[in-house]
Amino acid sequence: SGPAPLAPPRGVPAMAAPRALLAAAVLLSPLLSPLLSAGAAGAAPAPAPRNVSVLLEPGSGRLRVLPGRLPAAVAWASLDDRIPHVGWAFLEVTTNASYNDSLQAYAAGLAEAAVTEQLMYMHWMNTMVGYCGPFKYESEYCQKLRDYLEANLGWMEEQMGKGQDPEYWHQVRLALLQLKGLEDSYNRRLDFPRGRFTLAPFGFLLLQLGGDLEDLESALNRSSLQRVLGSGSCSALVKLLPGNRDLLVAHDTWNSYQSMLRLIKKYTLPFRASAGKSQIPGSIQVFSSYPGTIFSADDFYILSSGLVTLETTIGNNNPARWKYLDPRGSVLEWLRNIVANRLARSGPEWATVFRRFNSGTGLVVEADLTELLYQQGYWASYNVPYFEEIFNASGNLELVRKYGDWFTYDKNPRAQIFRRNQTLVHDLDSMIRLMRSNNYLQDPLSRCRGCDPPQNAENAISARSDLNPPNGTYPFPALRQRCHGGTDMKVTSSGMVPSFGLVAASGPTWDDVPPFRWSTSPCSSLLHMGHPDLWTFPPVKVHWD
């Protein structure tokens, strides 16, 4: 059968414009004035934020979702949908520490879906509809995937019931309960699970699986893979300003353009580390995300523990490692990510939590690179492993032998652009310019050996693969014309982190290249419900009341 979330929310026509769906004030910072020349002129006024509360009925013990912010609620959610104006919607979800953790987690999911259900529906239609649904002829792969996910969920359920390692499994259970609440709320089925519970393998769980799914498709022999050889999946930069004035941390997501219904979320979930224990260090999290997704998936987080965590994908290109995949004994990456963000108080602690129960192919090497940051002034990440052990184990040597320097850590185009241009970063403004940069027609470092034409829009800090000609010659698929590229930019600093502040820009870069417009792009036939047509959004400074 097809995935549960195929039906639109009740009372919502399938192609409805997003309904007025946060108490986050989005202010255009004067600091960013050079980048704000193209505001949303002529756009309709933004709708008022939408608020809901989840209440526990004292007599029946049932949960109800009601409009407004009611003081005795288990959870509250508030959504300010500014996608037509700035390319982002802003969501706050807060739970009440006077209730038990399980109730809080489930209610958090209920509240989030209640205010974002239209965005969830449109994002599902744009990105997941038909995945292992009734009309796709991938029945053998889909059955293998269903079996894998069901076995994995079953194994985790066993671990939660054993009572061993309660801190870890408590957080896993809370994350799954939150997802269950999200799904139940969307399907108008509010029923708090008091014991064991199940998740539909092809329901909203699929929206959590992004990076895991890329690997599972290869391992389970899906014939049409999502992952494209050489395809990057993010650029990140840690930059120490001259004189150690400030530390800036920035991240660009690279993704399919169909994924551009975007949220910035603030979760305040005062869970306990385990029964009767103190509150978790990462109870407050601000992160860039997507409808129906309870973690970042980009990933970029600012945490109440004082940590900022981010990643760029390192894919596995070594088929010999797939034999290590086992649904029993592993926790998928999205969950390990959530648990590490909640429990860790430091970088080493984060790595220790994250490496446990890795998905089989996982190889974690941890190191403190502070000295290197002091020496070279920056640290960049661009989908190529830094550590030799990971580089070799994931099959990169073979790619270097076959395709050359593009697959190396130090001579990859982005490695060279970061090395050259990071010296130009002296404040927030110049950091944003670097992270949004794509001057592929003029930049000699964007040239591609073996490509015709030689200048390639993939070879930049923020890719614009839609600009590559459809009839060019390219040595491997990532360099072709694709509806894929840098889809955002987020940056924070040591000064902004205590108040969970950040600056964020949504959509493909348009600093040195033509802006992306769905109606005139080679991607116009792809489903993009709820998206603005023209993507010319300035960076916005995000404050929280």
Which residue stretches match the model-derived regions?
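C-terminus-biased signal that marks the final domain/tail of proteins
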Residues: 16-21, 34-247, 256-261, 269-295, ...
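Classical eukaryotic N-terminal signal peptides for Sec-dependent ER targeting/secretion
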Residues: 2-28
